[in-house]
Amino acid sequence: MLFQTLKSIGELYKEPMDMVQRRLDSLSKPLGSLGRLEDIIKKLAGITGEVFPCVDKKAVIIMCADNGVVEEGISSCPKDVTSKVTRNFLKGITAINAFAKHTGSDIVVVDIGVDDDMDCEGIVKRKVRKGTWNIAKGPAMTRKEAIEAIEVGISIVEELGRKGVNLLGTGEMGIGNTTTSSAVSTVLTDSKAENMVGRGAGLSDEALKRKISIVKKAIDLNRPDANDPIDVVSKVGGFDIAGLAGCFIGAAACRIPILIDGFISATAALAAVRMEPKVKNFIFPSHGSAEPGSKKVMEALGFEPILNLEMRVGEGTGAALAFHIFDCAVSVYRNMGTFEDACIEQYQPQV
């Protein structure tokens, strides 16, 4: 399934993008004055093939999984917070619930690897295993499990596409996943661990040093192949990262625009793009995470964040916030009058 899906990914549709540009230039405003909003509309048209794209049915996919590396003391939170917060998503009391409600978005909570029996009503049960192994002692998962987790993400997106979802956000929950994301991104960007590892949920200076040493140890021990993103994710990643990588791949194949959230989902996006570079055409950034590795990953992807609010909540909150920007971009493009409507002579570009 994975490799067939990768092969099916196409290019952006050029003709609708050209038609959108002509309409943008006809609107009663200085040429290009809507800035990046114009880029958003053109890319939406290129993805969907629609000259008047819609983003009225939104969803945030939250991949939830535990990470064995937590036993190394790299997190300020106990392991059981993963299952507790996952349940809280379904109770409607988390940050992403508040943001999603405000933007009229659904949230899709996926148990892809929580180390608990998640028999909650409303959860999508796609558990690969109850948590990964400790990357400081060996690989996080087998290659087969990594592919299985990626395919979970692909299938979730396909299901949402069949339901008419036309804008996706990505989120995650998993204690220890800033450590695994740091390890994966360190390898994929050929960086030093010191430049990629952050404080996560609020580590002390001493705990931060330990976290850096654990990331270095995991990479030295497992020797992931930077040219094989599946190998990297399987050796030093997590089920949430693999699942989110699958979401980006699935969105590209289904031609559904999809937003990165923060550091973890950006790392997953980078892994997906390394599997198939055309995946990038279907991805949008949302916000600049406060995690130090996030900037490096976004640079590797060639993206500039739309928002910079120094957030590091995760859960898909940055993506949900950026949904507002997409709503505004679509609204101004659809509803603004043309020069003809305004009885104003059209601007001509100055050469």
Curated annotation (Swiss-Prot):
It is an enzyme of class 2 (transferase). It catalyses: 5,6-dimethylbenzimidazole + nicotinate beta-D-ribonucleotide = alpha-ribazole 5'-phosphate + nicotinate + H(+). Signal peptide: none annotated. Keywords: Cobalamin biosynthesis, Glycosyltransferase, Transferase. PANTHER family: NICOTINATE-NUCLEOTIDE--DIMETHYLBENZIMIDAZOLE PHOSPHORIBOSYLTRANSFERASE (PTHR43463:SF1). Catalyzes the synthesis of alpha-ribazole-5'-phosphate from nicotinate mononucleotide (NAMN) and 5,6-dimethylbenzimidazole (DMB). This is Nicotinate-nucleotide--dimethylbenzimidazole phosphoribosyltransferase. The gene is cobT.
